[in-house]
Amino acid sequence: MWQSFRTRPFSRTPALGSEAHSIFVTATDTNPLSAEPELVISEYAELFVSGLTVINQLTLGKTYVCTRDDSRVPGEGIPDVEFKQFKGPHPAGLAGTHIHMVDPVSENKTVWQIGYQDVIAIGHLFSTGQLMTERVVAIGGPRTSSPGLFKVRVGACLDDAVMSSSPNLDNARVVSGSVLSGRGSEPTKNYLGKFHNQITILEEGNHREFLGWQKPGFDKYSVTNIYGGSWLKGKLFPFTTSTGGSKRAMVPVGTYERVMPLDIL
């Protein structure tokens, strides 16, 4: 279970014998179509508390449990375990955001991060002496016929995992993880990633639209109001894997600064 921890900076497995200034438990998730961690933790409340107690002994500093502002996660009262609440859209649920706001790292200061399901697995190991071989994942996306939460094996084959929810995968891309940071299924990488709590299924955007740039775009989503679809508030759009064109330069017009919570630009 040691590889469940990741160092910040650099997101590496901690060296044996190393020590963290603090440990961050990510118990919130703002990725699109992700599961609500509170629901999963409630099914394994005792194991989660047991896991918190174990990992809290790995640092002389504090263990921060980062949750959504209105969630109720067990573990209050454990010495040196402090709960931090975050509110807002993605990336409010990312460990990097939490660390930047609570205990920023530097070249001489390292913290560790671990996901809530790995905390449950550690609690299971120390409570039963056996490895936990299952994980709860959210399966969703425009090509999913029956989205929901499913229990799958750790490292499960992606095609097998989505078979019950999406039997037809023609011209679809199965993504291990979020559409924002996940990994597309490939013949040699057709398995659930170690740190992924969701599987997303998208339509392959492998077709070109003739003179699409001249159309009003009422069927397209837009953040910057360049398409007519931006007038249709509340409408859901079936996203595909298309990026709408080739790679382009990042032009400093303030768009990225509005969605970047960290002071790095």
Task: For each feature predicted by the language model, list its residue ranges.
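Buried, small/hydrophobic-residue-enriched core segments of structured protein domains
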Residues: 1-265
